[in-house]
Amino acid sequence: VMATIGMFIGLSFTFAMILGPIVADAFGLSGLFWFTGFLTILAMLMIQFMVPYSVSKAPRGDSVALPEQISKLIRHPQLSRLNWGVFILHMALTACFITLPKQFVASGLALENHWQIYLPTLLGSFFLMVPFMIIAMKKQQEKPMFSGAVALLSLALFLLWLLPLGFWSLVLSVVLFFTAFNYLEATMPSILSRLAPAGVKGSVMGIYSSSQFLGAFAGGIVGGFVASLYGEQSIFLVMALMSLIWLALSFGMQKLKKSKSFSFITNIHTDERAEEVSELLINMPGIIEATLVQDEPRTSGKGKAHAVAYLKVDEKIVDLLAVKALLHQET
């Protein structure tokens, strides 16, 4: 699910790159803002009238951010690699597009015709990255494929910096850039959800999304600053060096384990019993991670606080019946 969401984020950028020049050419810069406003209203109507009504029964930690956990999660060694990664990825994207459209114009492609190059290059890069996603998931090679995509991103940025200005050199570099970008954009949310500690997925996703948009914000500032001091071509070099830092960080990622998350309402009422059950759970075969949160009220209307157990398990090994029996023992 998370990989699919990531893919559609990448596709939305693809369509934005195609439609942007067309709308701007037809209606001017103000037309872009009117078009964005129209799409926003359309999205609101879709949510209101097309998304099925549902009542969420998800425990609090998996659906919303928990402020008391944010500081700890920011320092999490594995999650921080992804947070810095998405920051650098979107910083590079924003910074590069300060100068990339100008370079296409200089190579002979009129601004209003940029969609003619963005459409095939972005769609081509999308189809190029799909086989690598399939191989990574089927062969359980997510970590080397991930590092390879970051390396490809670095290569594309170095090529944009090194190669002499020309239409086909730009096309080659942009295809490589967006192959890496689309792969990373699609896979990082999935990796993040698998690395997230049990019971704090809402906080983890919040930090990740904030890093993503802060990266886009920083890209505009850093790109403009570098261009004013050293020229626009230097933007590619600075972003390539930043991506090399990310590549070094990616080598420290842990190998991803196949796991599934469960949450259970328990009959545990005291902190002492929660500690005892946590120890028993973590020693059971197939339990990768166990978190018991004592202060979440049940939704049954009784108002009595029961602990919620958040478990990350290996489905091939774990005995869920034994787990449920332990969690529902009367004390």
Could you tell me what each predicted segment is?
Residues 5-48:
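Helix-loop-helix hairpin linking two adjacent transmembrane segments in secondary transporters
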Residues 52-83:
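Juxtamembrane intracellular "pre-TM" segments in multi-pass secondary transporters
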